[in-house]
C-alpha cells in the first residue's frame, strides 16, 4: 500500500456541472463531485449565482462536503465528517481602480470535510484556500493602473477561527485565532 491508503489505490471519480444562463447578467449553476478512493468516499456540492453588469459583479455560493472513511475492522462502522461554507464575492470598477472583496463563513467537523474556495489574487496566481473548523474568511483586493507604465495590486486577507486559540504548530504557530496575509505586487512596463 501507498502512504495514507488502506489498500492498493483504485478510484472512481465523477463530476457533473450545470450552468443556466437566465439572462445576460444572471447565471445559476451547480456542481457535484463523487470520489471513492481506497475506502474513502468524498462528496462535494456547490450551488452558485452570478450577477454582473458593466460596473459591478456579485457571486453567491454555498458549498457542502461529506467525507466517509470505511473502517478496517469488520464489526466497526466508519467515520462520517460533514462541512459547509457560505461565500460572497463582490467587485466594482471605478475609473482607474478595481476593487473586489470576498466574505465567507465555514463550519466543518474536521480536516477531512475541509472546503476549497477560489479567492481572487495577484497577477499570475491562483488561490484556492482550504478551510476547516469554524470561522470566517474575508479579503479585499485593490488593483490600480496608475498610468500606462505602472500597475499596483494589493490584497489583504484575514481568517478568524471560532473553534481554536492557536493556529498551526511548531515555528509557524500563531498564538491567537486570527491569521492575516498581505500581498503587494508592482508591475512596471517599459
Residue ranges of model-derived segments:
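Exposed, low-structure sequence patches enriched in small/polar residues
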Residues: 1-190
